């Protein structure tokens, strides 16, 4: 109760002193006549973002009052040119140059270049610039632009209220750079800046602002209490903060931080012990903070809709920064390190941060010469020693006579010089000079009230702070730390989506969302457009975390959507979840032991893989067939995208299709994908089907072509059917390939036929995925023997001139190698003579012999069984090794019977659809021939003799005719 009483007393006295101060003469400005009902401009801050928007925010709540759209603060190229790439800073116009994939800071900024232009650098670069100033008046309540003043013209949109209109000055700087030796190298940029009064000291503003380097997040804290006052998301990077006053803009200080660093700050803002040391608020000397011990300066390289840019930002030790490659050993020996104990290192030295030095994981922009630019956080670059020499000199004054000698000053070098120190004009001194009486009255009243209230309310105040403190999402870096020390109340605040749960993150790992984390140092693979795959965990399960640059978020979402629909199949990689942060999208996928490329190239991988090579090929085809049945075209089939999973509890491994980033869905009612701007050329050189390059549309056969290349690559231990990589794509377009290395395989004829059908130049003549699965190359020994028996039964009673027999007996001498009796062993040859006669040149008789010996295998003599071997593998190998073309020949011949019930399991639907009109036509012709032959036989047959009956004469009529006069 006493604390409450004193609190009310404090508020009453504070209001009383404020009334006295306001009523004091001289407190109000002479020109101020705005009523009490109108909103004061001093409570409004303007936030400028890179897209050119000026947003008026309430300084107490962060609520957006109005928005004014202007030209973008920065416009710069998005392309990277070899040795001629510059990155401007939208905060102050400073410049960074990219050379040899390394960033350096130039000692001058865009405004300085414009003031010095035209000028020339010592590196042969020519600079030209221009400057345009403009004033525009706005209504501070609505943000409406009411008047524009410039040297060219003056436009008034509506009648200006001189009492309320505030004029803002804006300067547009345009700079162009040209290579003296190469006119093709040019660079242009436009930088807009607002004229503003500088606040004299940082501690005069009661708030401390933090802005994200890549997004428009703003966090605002009370400088004294450390309480977070408000947060706002403006969607675009913040470049400047201003206090809107009657006399114009007053620039406000703010810190730029990395997005992840701001998230870490949000996790600790209510921790009493860490808060003052982290941000330096509520400290004895606010100017002297411990930011240098907790955060590290870095350079953020980003890309907006208006071009590339670079902003210096503070990051913590968990943020990965890129460091330029070391080009060589140091020429001079460096100083000896200072010997420090481990305790001294922990106290005085900042923690080590992970730095990527050798492998650029996300090459976002790359030139043909190999120079690349990485988007993300870089070590703060060193300043170059580049200088520029102005070419303009002062014009002589009027007192100089014509023809007199003009003393020209030497050219000034604009380069890395010592920065000038400006005397700070304190904001408190401004108040003291302009309004001394209310200032002193307020100061004395506040001091007295603080002394009388703080000592009585100290304990209650501490308790109130402790009970109102909320802990956000907790990250435990040390799993061994006691649980009781880590337990705290959790909060739902924080605009970064921290979940109310606790996860343990191993040292060096990073968390994304509430369940997903990964190890940045454990890279499993890299892909195009900056894609990197890390080892990670999802909800305790080991997974592969695929990180995609946010610029390609469309592809990441499409990949996730397609995986959700297709990952139920055992041979499509499993998808778990997708998370995101400021720069990347993260996909949690099934963790695999190796890719098919690793299996072929690395022998140690083959030793750890228990699945057979032919099973890998068949399972990959099965996964692709599932995609095609789901109307999905993969478009990037290659050995790197066929993965082998970890062994299951039963020790089984699987082959799965992965990387759905380039997949496209065939729209309903269509059979192909048009090659427009959205589709583009998809795939990897050397594995792209020819129609992708020369046709306006593509479809499922593009995957079959790539799969055929993969089959040959796997069966030949790393050889490509279209030759070396240099001429590979040209050979693909021309249809020039060789399969000669398949001759070393036992099933060389089957492999040759399968791959040749998959690599056909005509897409419509290639096999479908189902036809590939039904090809005899993938049949087991049991299925092959059963097929031979079914064919023998089918043609046993057929006539010699029947269509199927004629097909089987075509080129029979080649199939049976001149005579199959000469190729079998003597024991089997002798046994065959005992029962019936076999024709040595007949494929049908060879199939009959195989069928009979299989059915009567146990009745065969011992020597014959030993020669044939066990059923099915050795028995089948006995015949196929002697007649390697037999299975393929019979398979092609009996396509005629693919529609019959017995043979449906051996052929795919597309084979039956292809053979149906052929069979129908053949049967129609045979039926017609039979009818014609029957008619011809009937016509040639002898006719039976016609039996005629003799005529019977009427004797009575004869008599009458012979005796007419009888009467």
Curated annotation (Swiss-Prot):
Cofactor(s) needed by this chain: Mg(2+)
Annotated Gene Ontology cellular component terms: endoplasmic reticulum membrane; IRE1-TRAF2-ASK1 complex; neuronal cell body
Domain Protein kinase: 518-778
Known regulation of activity: The kinase domain is activated by trans-autophosphorylation. Kinase activity is required for activation of the endoribonuclease domain.
Post-translational modification note: Autophosphorylated mainly on serine residues.
Biological process terms in GO annotation: determination of adult lifespan; endoplasmic reticulum unfolded protein response; intrinsic apoptotic signaling pathway by p53 class mediator; intrinsic apoptotic signaling pathway in response to endoplasmic reticulum stress; IRE1-mediated unfolded protein response; mRNA processing; negative regulation of multicellular organismal process; nematode larval development
Membrane topology: Single-pass type I membrane protein
TM ranges: 439-455
Localization: Endoplasmic reticulum membrane
MF terms (GO), sorted A to Z: ATP binding; protein serine kinase activity; protein serine/threonine kinase activity; RNA endonuclease activity; unfolded protein binding
KEN domain mapped to chain residues: 781-909
Alphabetical list of PROSITE patterns matching this protein: KEN (PS51392), PROTEIN_KINASE_DOM (PS50011), PROTEIN_KINASE_ST (PS00108)
EC code: 2.7.11.1, 3.1.26.-
Topology, Lumenal side: 22-438
Recorded phenotype for the gene knockout or disruption: In combination with RNAi-mediated knockdown of atf-6, causes sluggish movement, arrested development at the L2 larval stage, and lethality soon thereafter; larvae have intestinal degeneration and develop many vacuoles in the intestinal cells. In combination with RNAi-mediated knockdown of pek-1, larvae have intestinal degeneration and develop many vacuoles in the intestinal cells. RNAi-mediated knockdown restores fertility, reduces the accumulation of unspliced tra-2 in the cytoplasm and suppresses germ line masculinization caused by RNAi-mediated knockdown of rnp-4/RBM8A.
A Pfam family reported for this protein in Swiss-Prot or TrEMBL: Pkinase
Entry annotation: catalytic residues: 636 (proton acceptor)
Primary role: Senses unfolded proteins in the lumen of the endoplasmic reticulum via its N-terminal domain which leads to enzyme auto-activation. The active endoribonuclease domain splices xbp-1 precursor mRNA to produce the mature form which then induces transcription of UPR target genes. Unfolded protein response (UPR) transcriptional activation by ire-1, as well as translational attenuation by pek-1 in a complementary pathway, maintains ER homeostasis. Regulates the transcriptional up-regulation of nucleoside-diphosphatase apy-1 and many other genes, upon ER stress.
Listed name of the protein: Serine/threonine-protein kinase/endoribonuclease ire-1
Taxonomic source organism: Caenorhabditis elegans
Gene, per the UniProt record: ire-1
């Amino acid at each position: 109760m006493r604390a409450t009483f004193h609190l009310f007393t404090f508020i009453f006295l504070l209001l009383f002193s404020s009334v006295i101060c306001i009523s004091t003469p001289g407190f109000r400005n002479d020109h101020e006549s705005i009523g009490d009902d109108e909103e004061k401009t001093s409570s409004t801050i303007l936030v400028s973002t890179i897209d050119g928007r000026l947003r008026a925010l309430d300084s107490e709540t962060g609520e957006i009052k109005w928005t004014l759209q202007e030209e973008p603060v920065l416009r710069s190229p998005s392309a990277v040119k070899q040795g001629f790439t510059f990155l401007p800073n939208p905060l102050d116009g400073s410049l960074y140059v990219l050379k040899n994939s390394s960033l350096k800071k130039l000692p001058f900024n865009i405004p300085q270049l414009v003031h010095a232009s035209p000028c020339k650098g010592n590196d042969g670069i020519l600079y030209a610039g221009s400057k345009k100033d403009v004033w525009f008046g706005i209504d501070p309540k609505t943000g409406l632009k009411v008047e524009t003043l410039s040297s060219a013209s003056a436009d008034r949109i509506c009648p200006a209220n001189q009492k309320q209109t505030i004029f803002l000055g804006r300067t547009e700087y345009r700079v162009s750079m040209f290579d003296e030796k190469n006119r093709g190298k040019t660079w242009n940029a436009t930088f807009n800046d607002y004229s503003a009064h500088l606040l004299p000291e940082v501690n005069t503003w009661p708030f401390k602002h933090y802005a994200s380097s890549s997004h428009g997040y703003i966090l605002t804290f009370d400088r004294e209490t450390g309480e977070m006052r408000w947060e706002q998301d403006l969607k675009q990077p913040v470049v400047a903060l201003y206090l809107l006053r009657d006399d114009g803009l007053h620039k406000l200080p703010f810190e730029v931080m990395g997005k992840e660093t701001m998230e870490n700050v949000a996790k600790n803002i209510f921790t009493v012990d860490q808060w003052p040391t982290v941000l330096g608020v509520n400290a004895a000397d606010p100017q002297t903070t411990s930011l240098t011990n907790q955060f590290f300066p870095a350079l953020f390289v980003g890309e907006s809709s208006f071009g590339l840019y670079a902003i210096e930002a503070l990051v913590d030790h968990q943020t990965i920064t890129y460091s330029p490659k070391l080009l060589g050993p140091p020429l001079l020996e460096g100083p000896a390190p200072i010997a420090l104990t481990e305790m001294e290192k922990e106290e005085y030295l900042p923690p080590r941060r992970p730095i990527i030095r050798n492998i650029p994981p996300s090459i976002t922009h790359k030139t043909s010469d190999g120079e690349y630019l990485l988007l993300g956080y870089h070590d703060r670059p060193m300043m170059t020693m580049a200088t520029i020499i102005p070419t303009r000199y002062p014009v002589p004054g009027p007192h100089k006579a014509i023809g007199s000698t003009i003393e020209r000053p030497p050219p000034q070098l604009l380069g890395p010089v010592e920065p000038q120190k400006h005397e700070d004009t304190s904001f408190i001194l401004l108040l003291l000079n302009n309004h001394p009486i209310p200032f002193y009255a307020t100061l004395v009243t506040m001091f007295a009230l603080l002394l009388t209230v703080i000592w009585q309310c100290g304990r209650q105040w501490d308790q109130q702070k402790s009970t109102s403190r909320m802990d956000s999402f907790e990250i435990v870096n040390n799993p061994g730390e006691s649980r009781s020390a880590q337990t705290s109340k959790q909060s739902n605040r924080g605009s970064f989506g921290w979940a109310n749960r606790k996860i343990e993150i191993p040292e060096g790992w990073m968390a994304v969302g509430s369940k997903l984390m990964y190890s940045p140092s454990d890279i499993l693979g890299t892909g195009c457009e900056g894609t990197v795959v890390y080892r990670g965990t999802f909800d305790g399960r080991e997974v592969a975390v695929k990180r995609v640059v946010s610029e390609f978020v469309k592809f990441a979402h499409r990949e996730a959507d397609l995986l959700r629909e297709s990952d139920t199949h055992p041979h499509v990689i499993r998808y778990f979840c997708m998370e995101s942060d400021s720069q990347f999208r993260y996909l949690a996928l099934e963790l695999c032991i190796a890719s098919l490329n690793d299996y072929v190239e690395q022998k140690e991988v083959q030793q750890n893989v228990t699945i057979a090579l032919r099973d890998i090929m068949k399972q990959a085809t099965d996964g692709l067939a599932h995609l095609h049945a789901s109307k999905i075209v993969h478009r990037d089939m290659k050995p790197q995208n066929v993965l082998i999973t970890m062994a299951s509890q039963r020790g089984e491994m699987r082959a799965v299709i992965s990387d759905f980033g380039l997949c496209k869905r065939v729209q309903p009612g269509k059979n192909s994908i048009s090659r427009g701007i959205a589709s583009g050329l998809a795939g990897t050189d050397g594995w792209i089907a020819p129609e992708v390059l020369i046709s306006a549309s593509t479809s499922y056969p593009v995957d079959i072509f790539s799969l055929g290349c993969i089959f040959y690559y796997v069966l030949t231990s790393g050889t490509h059917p279209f030759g070396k990589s240099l001429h590979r794509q040209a050979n693909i377009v021309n249809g020039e390939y060789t399969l000669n290395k398949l001759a070393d395989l036992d099933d060389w004829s089957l492999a040759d036929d399968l791959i040749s059908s998959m690599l056909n130049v005509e897409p419509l003549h290639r096999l479908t995925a189902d036809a590939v699965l039904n090809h005899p190359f993938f049949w087991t020994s049991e299925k092959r023997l059963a097929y031979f028996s079914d064919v023998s039964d089918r043609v046993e009673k057929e006539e010699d001139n029947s269509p199927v027999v004629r097909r089987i007996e075509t080129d029979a001498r080649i199939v049976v190698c001149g005579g199959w009796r000469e190729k079998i062993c003597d024991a089997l040859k002798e046994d065959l003579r005992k029962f019936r006669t076999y024709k040595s040149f007949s494929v049908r008789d060879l199939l009959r012999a195989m069928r009979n010996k299989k059915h009567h295998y146990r009745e065969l003599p011992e020597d014959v069984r030993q020669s044939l071997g066990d059923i099915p593998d050795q028995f089948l190998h006995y015949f196929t090794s002697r007649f390697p073309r037999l299975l393929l020949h019979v398979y092609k011949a009996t396509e005629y019977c693919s529609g019959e019930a017995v043979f449906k399991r051996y052929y795919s639907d597309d084979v039956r659809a292809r053979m149906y009109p052929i069979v129908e036509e053949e049967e129609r012709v045979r039926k017609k021939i039979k009818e014609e032959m029957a008619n011809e036989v009937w016509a040639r047959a002898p006719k039976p003799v016609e039996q005629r009956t003799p005529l019977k004469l009427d004797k009575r009529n004869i008599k009458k005719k012979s005796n007419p006069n009888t009467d």
